Design a protein with these regions (language model features):
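Left-handed beta-helix
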Residues: 1-4, 198, 206-372
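Unchanged
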Residues: 1-254, 364-366
Length: 372
């Protein structure tokens, strides 16, 4: 493909509360065996993009460990490959990334060394499948300066979490508001953009000269009347995990057969780093209904409408309902978990009860397994 990829994975999201105290949003576990960034990386690979840069910053250790080998997404190649960039203090720069445009600016040498004519920019915290070649063909046909991938939200969804845009009959963007207090449209930006590489370099350098650091505010919105910026509307599944509720809903969506089949049975595939573990074990007396249970787990109790990640131990007489249990959690005997997200590497003590009565509850308990 005639494009290089950039995945923005360095942002800090306070709306994820305790879940991002240990990891970046892009490293959040999804659907039992995946990380959020796997979807963007798989889309890049399936679109035959040979060179991809991932820009990381906050709580990047877990994310960097996940990306330590590029072979899982077929980027282990002599030409191109997967590049992971973190903020670097140099003689000319002493700052962390001050925004999305600044993150690209601090790694502009990467783009200048590339030869591909186009750049695809996406975030690492969205769950979706996409062939970027179709978007690029649209971008070229429209003779656009920038193409923004967008979609219509379903009725009742909160549009104020996203950039809101309005387009004319030719799909040219006429108005763009970033996370407004009141949404005047249900068409949102998905945070996926296509732009010519030389033009991106010029816009980023010009923004840096004026101390402007945000790609949406200081480039898209600022130049919407000066540049030909078009929208490319999608209808397939897309979800951004920017809040605890959105993260919970996204994982629960994978309990729906149509969503699960779309991602895991229909080609192209979604790839992730592989961990060699035995299959989940269901001991006598275990009851599992409408749930995803990942490898390495041992089930002795009841699991209903839940997603269990790798190496989860469910004790005797435990009941888990409508919950997400992250990696390497030990649930003692006679525990009751409902409408909760249990953080990874936790020990839930026996004979305890956790219920999210007013929404999704994040459960973090002291991990006594590692106490000396």
């Amino acid at each position: 493909m005639r494009a290089v990829g950039i995945i923005l994975a360095g942002g800090n999201n306070n709306k994820m509360r305790e879940l991002t105290q240990r990891r970046a949003v892009a490293a959040m576990p999804i659907a039992g065996s995946y990380r959020a960034i796997d979807f963007a990386l798989s889309n890049m690979s399936n679109s035959h993009i040979q060179k991809v840069a991932v820009l990381t910053q906050y709580n990047a250790r877990s994310l960097n460990e996940h990306l330590n080998s590029s072979k899982w997404w077929d980027f282990g190649r002599k030409q191109g490959g997967l590049y992971v960039f973190t903020p670097t203090i140099t003689a000319d720069n002493g700052y962390w990334y001050r925004g999305t445009a600044d993150a690209i600016y601090q790694n502009l040498d990467f783009l200048k060394r590339c030869h591909e004519p186009y750049v695809i920019i996406t975030s690492g915290d969205a769950v979706y499948k996409m062939d970027y070649n179709k978007v690029l063909e649209y971008h070229i046909a429209k003779k656009a300066d920038i193409t923004v991938v967008c979609r219509d939200l379903d009725q009742g969804e909160d549009a104020t979490r996203f950039g809101i845009l309005k387009m004319n009959e030719n799909m040219r963007i006429e108005n763009f508001e970033e996370k407004p207090m009141v949404a005047n449209s249900n068409t949102i930006s998905t945070g996926i953009y296509i732009i010519r590489r030389r033009q991106l370099i010029d816009l980023i350098e010009h923004s840096a000269e004026e101390d402007r650091y945000d790609f949406v505010t200081d480039i898209l919105i600022r130049y919407k009347n000066l540049k030909k910026i078009y929208g490319y509307k999608i209808k397939d599944y897309w979800s951004n995990i920017s809040t605890v509720d959105a993260y919970y809903k996204t994982n629960m969506d994978f309990l729906k057969p149509e969503v699960r089949n779309y991602f895991f049975k229909q080609l192209p595939s979604i790839y992730s780093k592989v961990t060699d573990l035995p299959p989940a074990k269901y001991n006598p007396g275990a009851v599992v209904k409408n749930s995803l249970v990942a490898s390495g787990s041992i089930i002795n109790g009841t699991v209903e409408n839940s997603v269990l990640f790798k190496k989860v131990f469910v004790g005797n007489n435990c009941v888990i309902k409508n919950s997400i249990i992250l990696n390497d959690v030990y649930l003692g005997d006679n525990t009751y978990i409902e409408n909760c997200i249990v953080e990874s590497r936790d020990t839930i003590r026996a004979n305890t009860r956790h219920v999210g009565e007013d929404g999704v509850k994040v459960v973090i308990e002291k991990n006594e397994r590692y106490a000396l």
